[in-house]
């Protein structure tokens, strides 16, 4: 038995299972039989036939086998097999499939047999059917631990239970790309996608039916094989056997079977093969295929015209042409007693619901060739061959018969139950769509009669839906050829086509056409049009009634036209119009909405009694006494307009529909739109607000601007790394890479230095050689002459020897003297280009005449060269004689290297190395091609001329003034020029504090008092003219310039006779003038220096103690009669902070500061009889500035932050703290104790940098340390009291770190 995985078969949808997934159009999987575990072997199953024991893989295969092929099965009791029959949708059938009711079912009578094909995997029992086995397995609750919370079904695996729950929850994540269908499983979606495939490559060679798979075609061909072997006279295979060998119409090749002929045509003559999109037409005599109906008719007339085989199926009369046969068939439809049309009988009857027994009888088909004027009431897919009729409705034509069911598509099988028919339709005719049932109250579309009954009970509160439905008037139609009664024209049309059509396949595939007025049936469209034109458009005609009733009691069908189509098709029912709009205009609202809104042209329903009565009266008036109507006229039933052509009549009806159909307007702004889609887009704009957010890709946070997102990315998702360029290792902090460099790349290198001559050597061997040659050989003679290299034992000997090297060697060209001959020779070679092989006797005149002649010639040549070159050396600076220079004897150019000189001579004078310069001097001066326009000197290269021209132009000016754009050759000249642009030339006052500056020293000192003017990028700024300077030299130039311009200012006054007057100094408070600077006290207030007289200082002490004197400042005498009005007017004292000048403690108010001074610093309180201030023992810590770097060292207590100026005072102060408080200093943050405040402060620093990777950063200058105590030492040495950041709100103390403030608050102010 095969155990490979196979998808379970598709099945009809159970109406009671409301959480099923819809598969395909009208197909669903049963909630009980639906496969949940496609991946498990225990959930897969195979199907076997009970009669012949043949095994099948799907339910559709075994169903088709039992119906058509199995010789041991009757073919009508298939529904007895639960694995093949269709489950009923009634409540009783639901109980049978529920696992909770499985105990009451007798499914285990056959268990225990050793040969049964379905054994239980949990026990020894076996069963004959798979359904029995599934019911039995549900009893093993201990083996199936997972239970569905909806239907209590048990599962072995959790994934099976979860997949099953999706059936109840409706979780459908697999969507069809072609339509809006959704499925919970991918295999169901694959099955559904096959319905959208228009290409069916597998064609039946007999009936030309298409299939999606070869297996389906193989099963279909078995049906033809069974029919071929049987004794059916109407079989097409028998017809083919009776015929001669078939021949191809193209190549005259003969074939025994039609499938061989069709295969030959498809392969050899593809242009002659019928199109797959259209149904092929086959001749009833020779079975030749045709594409068009006209070709088939011409073929029958020409080839088979002599044979009278066009027989009538009613009277067996034969005709030569098909048209004659059609005319004869029309005569059969005329009644014998009258000349009226033999239309199908209309009987107003009620129908009884059969939902209790066959609720799924709604299997209907939508014919694509339906006549537009036919009523669109849902058609029944299964039709009855005989139905029980009452004698009042049908008269003698009614008869009692057993209810049987037959397929309307293949018309070959009879089924005893509707369930078997449903299985047949689902397995054999999957390509046929499904139709629904419509409620007569609210016109709601329902999938089945059972759902219709439930809808009537719940919505319309019907106690007995069967009685209500039967009481409702309905129109039924009776076939004139048999006793069949149907409920709509479409069903009657299918009945006539299938039961009373010709044997000709072309005639069978065509539709029967019914008149919408009298319901007369016609076999051709042309005959129907002729009938409407001749009968219903002629007032003289009297054929209007039914042949059964004999009186015009039938209501006139109202006409509805689609206004969205170009040809304006006409429909006689709103339902048909709605269906047309749904299929062809999906975005257009249905016409049913217009009827409910009261916008229909006629308010009465066509089936209502009032409408029937009114239309009947109108028709009677028209038939009886109305005016005569001309033939071929069309009269509008809305306005009475008459038209002679059908096109103009349809166009006129379209105008009525345009006025009836409402306009699509926006409920917000009343704007009109042509269709529903544009209206929906417009209305969405009213309810839509577009907001732009910028989302972080890492943490999904939203930001309203790009700047916020970039700031977030820089703060949270950006890391700065440090890469070592030596080993390419990466570090996350600066401290880490510093440690890495100190550990791995700090290589030790030893240098060996000689202590005697301070020479350095790389290794010890070189030092030993040096000592051997320089110190051992001349041992005892450590003093060496720098001129001749001779060594001496004592320094006195060396000094006596140096006197012998007096400058006795004089140069005969420039009169320079040298100590040694070698220096003179070097000077001659470098400066005068004299190369002598023999040292001349410079002290005597004993030189030979030849030597003197050569020297004279060379001297003359050099003199002439200097004169002709326009004093080239004069334009350049003198070269230092200590550096070796190589001069050109032609142009006088000097170079520091001999190779540069050789390159110059080769480039500019065409003199190669080694050639005699004296021989070519005169000739070389004339050969140059590049001539100087200034001095007429020639050069051999353009670069040489360019360098020479620079000597005439002067130095290159690379420095440009940023104010006026003038260029200068040096930075010094540019600085002196920039000062001339100053706007403060006549004042020497600081533009920030307005303090007068009298000298350059005061100017430079005052610039240091404004630290906010410093900038590490641009340098300093002058306090007088506010220009930016880049160096201290430039700042000094500014000071010199400004002090020279202000030399006749306010501080230095001159009389008319030019006599110098003594410099005066003013008090910054009372503006009194003093002749001596010592009479004023210099104060540093807010970083600015001020001068106050003694009286102002004394009075400001009593009113505002915050103004203090710096230590070491001179205290002049205090005047008793000095006024404070000027100081009060200026408001100088009011701007001082309330901070104690002695201990630098800040207070909130002046009263607290006064109390502090009276109690703590009594020695600073001035005595009324005293005229001088006392020098305080404790003074505030001054600001550290460049001008105050030489002040006294201060000491500050960590505990109370008092400042002392000597170590003894702070030691005594700390000892008092230890006596009062002891050695236990507790950290309030972690309850640790320390023996000193310094250790406690170091511990609090560690608290501040917890989680920072072991690094400690200074909060003031941001210097990084790896130890907390190093940071503590740095703070004490580099930063003072004024740099502390955190102030205590309850006392004047300040702290560097927040943890210090927290610990201080918890210790001192916790109460």
From Swiss-Prot:
Keywords: Activator, Developmental protein, Differentiation, DNA-binding, Isopeptide bond, Metal-binding, Nucleus, Phosphoprotein, Proto-oncogene, Repeat, Repressor, Transcription, Transcription regulation, Ubl conjugation, Zinc, Zinc-finger. There is a cross-link at residue 1146 (Glycyl lysine isopeptide (Lys-Gly) (interchain with G-Cter in SUMO2)). A zinc finger (C2H2-type) spans 47-67, 118-140, 146-168, 174-196, 202-224, 246-269, 281-304, 310-332, 405-429, 437-460, 477-500, 513-536, 560-585, 634-656, 664-686, 694-717, 722-745, 752-775, 783-805, 809-832, 886-908, 930-952, 959-981, 1020-1042, 1065-1083, 1138-1161, 1195-1217, 1225-1247, 1256-1279, 1286-1309. Residues 83-102, 1105-1119 have a biased composition (Low complexity). PROSITE patterns: ZINC_FINGER_C2H2_1 (PS00028), ZINC_FINGER_C2H2_2 (PS50157). Pfam families: zf-C2H2, zf-C2H2_6, zf-met. It is found in: Nucleus. The keyword RNA-binding does not apply. The modification Phosphoserine is found at residues 546, 605, 608. Residues 359-370, 387-398 have a biased composition (Polar residues). Transcription factor that can both act as an activator or a repressor depending on the context. Involved in BMP signaling and in the regulation of the immature compartment of the hematopoietic system. Associates with SMADs in response to BMP2 leading to activate transcription of BMP target genes. Acts as a transcriptional repressor via its interaction with EBF1, a transcription factor involved specification of B-cell lineage; this interaction preventing EBF1 to bind DNA and activate target genes. Uses different DNA- and protein-binding zinc fingers to regulate the distinct BMP-Smad and hematopoietic system. This is Zinc finger protein 521. It comes from Mus musculus (Mouse). The lineage of its organism: Eukaryota, Metazoa, Chordata, Craniata, Vertebrata.
């Amino acid at each position: 038995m095969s155990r490979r995985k196979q998808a379970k078969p598709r099945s009809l949808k159970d109406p009671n299972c409301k959480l099923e997934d819809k598969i395909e159009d009208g197909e669903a999987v049963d909630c009980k039989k639906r496969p949940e575990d496609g991946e498990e072997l225990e959930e897969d199953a195979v199907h076997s036939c009970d009669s012949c024991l043949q095994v099948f893989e799907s339910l559709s295969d075994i169903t088709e086998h039992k119906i058509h092929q199995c010789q041991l099965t009757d073919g009508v009791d298939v529904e007895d097999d639960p694995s093949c029959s269709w489950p009923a949708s009634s409540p009783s059938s639901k109980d049978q499939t529920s696992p909770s009711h499985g105990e009451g079912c007798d499914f285990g009578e056959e268990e225990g047999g050793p040969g049964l094909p379905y054994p239980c995997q949990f026990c020894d029992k076996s069963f004959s059917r798979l359904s029995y086995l599934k019911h039995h397995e549900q009893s093993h609750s201990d083996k199936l631990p997972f239970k569905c919370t909806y239907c209590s079904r048990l599962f072995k695996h959790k994934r099976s239970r979860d997949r099953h729950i999706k059936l109840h929850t409706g979780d459908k994540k697999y969507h069809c790309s072609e339509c809006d269908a959704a499925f919970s499983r991918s295999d169901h979606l694959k099955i559904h996608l096959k319905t959208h495939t228009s290409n069916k490559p597998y064609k039946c060679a007999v009936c030309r039916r298409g299939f999606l798979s070869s297996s389906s075609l193989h099963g279909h061909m078995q049906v033809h094989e069974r029919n071929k072997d049987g004794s059916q006279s109407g079989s097409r295979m028998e017809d083919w056997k009776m015929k001669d060998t078939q021949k191809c119409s193209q190549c005259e090749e003969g074939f025994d079977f039609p499938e061989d002929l069709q295969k030959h045509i498809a392969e050899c003559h593809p242009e002659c093969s019928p199109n797959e999109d259209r149904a092929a037409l086959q001749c009833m005599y020779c079975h030749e295929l045709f594409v068009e109906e006209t070709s088939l008719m011409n073929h029958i007339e020409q080839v088979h015209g002599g044979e009278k085989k066009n027989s009538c199926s009613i009277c067996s009369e034969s005709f030569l042409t098909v048209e004659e046969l059609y005319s004869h068939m029309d005569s059969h439809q005329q009644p014998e007693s009258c000349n009226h049309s033999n239309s199908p009988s209309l009987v107003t009857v009620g129908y009884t619901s059969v939902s209790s027994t066959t609720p799924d009888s709604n299997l209907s088909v939508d014919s694509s060739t339906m006549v537009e004027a036919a009523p669109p009431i849902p058609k029944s897919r299964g039709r009855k061959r005989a139905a029980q009729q009452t004698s009042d409705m049908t008269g003698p034509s009614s008869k009692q018969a057993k209810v049987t069911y037959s397929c309307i598509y293949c018309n070959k099988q009879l089924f005893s139950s509707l369930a078997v028919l449903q299985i047949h339709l689902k397995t054999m005719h999957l390509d046929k769509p499904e139709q629904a049932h419509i409620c007569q109250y609210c016109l709601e579309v329902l999938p089945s009669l059972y759902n219709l009954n439930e809808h009537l009970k719940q919505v319309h509160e019907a106690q007995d839906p069967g009685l209500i439905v039967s009481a409702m008037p309905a129109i039924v139609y009776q076939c004139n050829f048999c006793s069949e009664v149907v409920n709509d024209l479409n069903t009657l049309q299918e009945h006539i086509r299938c039961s009373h059509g010709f044997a000709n396949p072309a005639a069978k595939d065509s539709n029967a056409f019914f008149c919408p007025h009298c319901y007369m049936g016609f076999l051709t469209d042309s005959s129907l049009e002729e009938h409407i034109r001749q009968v219903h458009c002629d007032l003289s005609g009297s054929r209007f009634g039914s042949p059964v009733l004999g009186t015009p009691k039938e209501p006139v069908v109202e006409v509805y036209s689609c206004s969205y189509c170009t040809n304006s098709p006409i429909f006689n029912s709103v339902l048909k119009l709605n269906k047309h709009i749904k299929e062809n205009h999906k975005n257009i609202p249905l016409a049913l909405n217009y009827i409910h809104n009261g916008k229909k042209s006629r308010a009465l329903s066509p089936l209502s009694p009032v409408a029937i009565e009114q239309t009947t009266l109108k028709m009677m008036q028209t038939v009886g006494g109305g005016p005569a109507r001309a033939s071929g006229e069309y009269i509008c039933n809305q306005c009475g307009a008459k038209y002679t052509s059908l096109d103009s009549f349809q166009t006129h009806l379209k105008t009525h529909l345009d006025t009836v159909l409402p306009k699509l307007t926006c409920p917000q702004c009343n704007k009109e739109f042509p269709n529903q889609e544009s209206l929906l887009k417009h209305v969405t704009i009213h309810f839509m607000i577009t907001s732009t957010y910028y989302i972080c890709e890492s943490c999904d946070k939203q930001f309203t601007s790009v700047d916020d997102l970039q700031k977030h990315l820089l703060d949270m998702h950006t890391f700065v790394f440090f890469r070592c360029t030596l080993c390419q290792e990466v570090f996350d902090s600066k401290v880490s890479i510093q440690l890495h460099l100190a550990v791995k790349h700090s290589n030790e290198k030893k240098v060996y230095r000689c202590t005697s001559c301070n020479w350095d050597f790389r290794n010890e061997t070189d030092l030993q050689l040096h000592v051997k040659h320089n110190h051992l050989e001349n041992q005892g003679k450590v003093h060496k002459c720098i001129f001749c290299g001779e060594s001496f034992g004592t320094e006195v000997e060396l000094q006596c020897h140096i006197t012998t090297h007096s400058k006795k060697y004089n140069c005969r060209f420039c009169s320079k003297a040298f100590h040694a001959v070698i220096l003179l020779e070097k000077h001659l070679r470098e400066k005068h280009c004299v190369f002598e092989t023999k040292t001349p006797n410079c002290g005597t005149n004993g030189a030979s005449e030849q030597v003197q002649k050569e020297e004279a010639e060379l001297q003359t040549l050099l003199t002439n060269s200097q004169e002709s070159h326009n004093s080239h050396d004069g334009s350049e600076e003198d070269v230092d004689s200590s550096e070796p220079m190589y001069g050109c004897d032609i142009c006088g150019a000097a170079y520091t290297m001999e190779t540069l000189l050789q390159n110059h001579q080769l480039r500019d004078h065409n003199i190669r190395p080694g050639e005699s310069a004296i021989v070519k001097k005169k000739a070389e001066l004339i050969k140059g091609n590049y001539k100087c326009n200034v001095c007429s000197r020639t050069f051999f290269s353009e670069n040489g001329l360019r360098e020479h021209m620079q000597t005439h132009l002067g130095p290159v000016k690379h420095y440009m003034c940023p104010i006026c754009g003038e260029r200068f050759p040096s930075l010094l000249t540019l600085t002196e020029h920039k000062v001339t642009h100053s706007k403060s030339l006549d004042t020497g006052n600081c533009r920030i504090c307005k303090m007068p500056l009298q000298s350059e020293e005061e100017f430079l000192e005052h610039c240091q008092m404004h630290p906010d003017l410093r900038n590490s990028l641009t340098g300093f700024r002058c306090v007088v003219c506010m220009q930016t300077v880049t160096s201290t030299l430039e700042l000094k130039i500014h000071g010199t310039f400004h002090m020279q311009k202000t030399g006749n200012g306010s501080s230095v006054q001159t009389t008319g006779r030019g006599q110098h007057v003594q410099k005066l100094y003013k008090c910054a408070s009372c503006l009194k003038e003093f002749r001596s600077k010592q009479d004023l006290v210099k104060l540093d207030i807010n970083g600015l220096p001020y001068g106050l007289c003694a009286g102002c200082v004394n009075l400001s002490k009593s009113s505002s103690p915050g103004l203090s004197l710096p230590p070491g400042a001179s205290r002049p005498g205090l005047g008793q009669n000095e006024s404070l009005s000027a100081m009060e007017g200026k408001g100088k004292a009011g701007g001082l902070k309330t901070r104690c000048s002695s201990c630098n403690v800040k207070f909130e108010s002046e009263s607290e500061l006064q109390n502090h001074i009276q109690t703590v610093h009594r020695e600073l309180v001035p005595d009324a009889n005293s005229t001088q201030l006392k020098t305080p023992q404790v003074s505030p810590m001054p600001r550290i500035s460049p001008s105050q770097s030489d002040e006294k060292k201060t000491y500050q207590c960590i505990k109370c932050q008092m400042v002392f100026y000597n170590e003894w005072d702070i030691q005594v102060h700390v000892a008092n703290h230890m006596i009062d408080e002891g050695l236990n200093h507790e950290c309030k943050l972690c309850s640790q104790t320390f023996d000193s405040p310094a250790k406690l402060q170091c511990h609090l620093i560690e608290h501040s940098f917890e989680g920072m990777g072991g690094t400690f950063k200074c909060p003031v200058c941001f210097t990084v340390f790896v130890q907390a105590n190093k940071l503590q030492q740095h703070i004490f040495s580099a930063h003072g009291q004024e740099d502390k950041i955190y102030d205590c709100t309850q006392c004047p103390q300040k702290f560097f770190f927040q943890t210090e403030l927290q610990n201080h608050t918890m210790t001192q102010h916790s109460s």
